[in-house]
């Protein structure tokens, strides 16, 4: 704590987890007690801690963090970063598609998510129809139904590519998180076109294997993605 003057703590959507509220409560204690710790480290300057609800989850949590680091490298002040982050969070669009609807539905209902009904899970499994779920400002909503998981994944890739080509991204990056080996994701239809589009438009494609928490919540083999642009979702 004595090495830094300003800390941003960014959490998963408060509508999906109590982590945000707990972090806010913990921050009160930190801000009350930091003086002695900093003085022991030879630092007598003030310390600030900002807990931020990203209003999103999975790959969409990465964009605010990525942009925070970018703004820091650009030398922006903490106040400017804080103000910008509010806009980034409000413009952040996440997309989720999973191969196992029953699993995602059952896990989601435990956290208050009703975006996939029992009937949708039954019909989707029987007909191999996968919903594309949109996460934005703390809400999750199905926005498309596609036959086959790889085709649903392609719709996600195509949506990112469409928004990259259209311009106007608030953050010059798009993010992907996959619940498996990344080589599997790279082999899916639409991925190569997305990667090429990002290169052509100088937009960074940030990708990672999904963490254990994500896999537990939406299932092995799930794909999540995000882009940041003001306005409604622009779906391919």
Tell me the role of every PLM-derived stretch:
Residues 1-30, 34:
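N-terminal glycine-rich phosphate/adenylate-binding segment common to multiple enzyme folds
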Residues 19, 25-28, 38-40, 46-50, ...:
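Mixed-charge interfacial surface used for oligomerization/domain docking
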Residues 11-13, 52-55:
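Short beta-strand->loop
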């Amino acid at each position: 704590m004595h090495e830094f003057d300003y800390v941003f703590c960014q959490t998963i959507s408060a509508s999906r987890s109590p982590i945000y509220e707990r972090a806010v409560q913990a921050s009160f204690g930190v801000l009350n007690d930091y003086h002695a710790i900093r003085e022991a480290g030879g630092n007598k300057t003030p310390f600030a801690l900002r807990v931020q609800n990203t209003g999103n989850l999975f790959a969409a949590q990465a964009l605010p963090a990525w942009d925070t680091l970018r703004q820091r490298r650009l030398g922006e002040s903490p106040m400017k970063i804080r103000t910008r982050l509010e806009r980034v969070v409000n413009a952040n669009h996440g997309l989720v598609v999973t191969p196992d609807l029953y699993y995602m539905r059952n896990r989601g209902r435990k956290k208050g998510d009703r975006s996939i009904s029992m009937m949708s899970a039954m019909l989707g499994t029987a007909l191999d129809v996968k919903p594309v779920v949109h996460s934005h400002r703390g809400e999750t909503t199905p926005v498309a139904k596609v036959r086959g998981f790889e085709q649903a994944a392609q719709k996600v890739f195509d949506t990112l590519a469409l928004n990259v080509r259209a311009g106007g991204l608030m953050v010059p990056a798009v993010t992907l998180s996959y619940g498996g080996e990344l080589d599997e994701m790279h082999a899916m239809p639409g991925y190569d076109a997305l990667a090429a589009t990002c290169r052509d438009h100088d937009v960074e494609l940030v990708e990672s294997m999904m963490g254990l928490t994500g896999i537990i919540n939406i299932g092995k083999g799930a794909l999540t993605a995000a882009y940041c642009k003001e306005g409604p979702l622009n779906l391919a």
